[in-house]
Amino acid sequence: PKVTSISAGGANTFLTVDATRVASPGEKTADVRNLGRVVADTWACGRGIVGTLGNGRWTHMQGTPTKIPALSGLFEYDEKARAAIPIRMHSIAVGSTHAAAVMDNVTYLDASESSGENDTNWGADVLWWGGNEFYQLGTGKRNNVANPMYIRPLDMDAEGEVGRRGEQHRFHITPKHTVRIGGRKVSVEQRVECGRNVTAVYSGV
């Protein structure tokens, strides 16, 4: 296994780990399925009484890393690579009692008004968990959350205007891409930050 990132804040630490399937002692290489397959897992330690560990438990303190099932062992099919690839974390923002994970999933930003009506842009998934006393998770409620979860899009009024209120959309953020502003090409992306009982989503250059 290889630790690929460490994020810390409040009383918690999160680690992302890549593990490659190898043959165990006594196993024949020819008999091992998925040899060389990489699995990306996310682990957490620290305080969990308000759900910040993200493992579905309300543990007071976790001294050794515990796996976060909702953020581990995820795969998706990549059309370009024509293969299943692991979904890794792009980043984890850690606040005083809550956290948000931006996934490094496949994104698509080429849909336009001239493309078909079924052509849709989609960005990076974001999951939220932990303390929610001040509505910082964006769920519209104040209950703490022990499992990472998706939230609805921020502009629900616009969703209703186009007749989509019955559909289950979720909040995405735009990955880094190039746009033209005032005649100049600028690289922009949306980012998530968690602080002390507050969350911010903003566009950065």
Could you tell me what each predicted segment is?
Residues 1-10, 15-77, 84-94, 101-205:
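Periodic beta-strand elements of RCC1/NHL beta-propellers and select beta-solenoids
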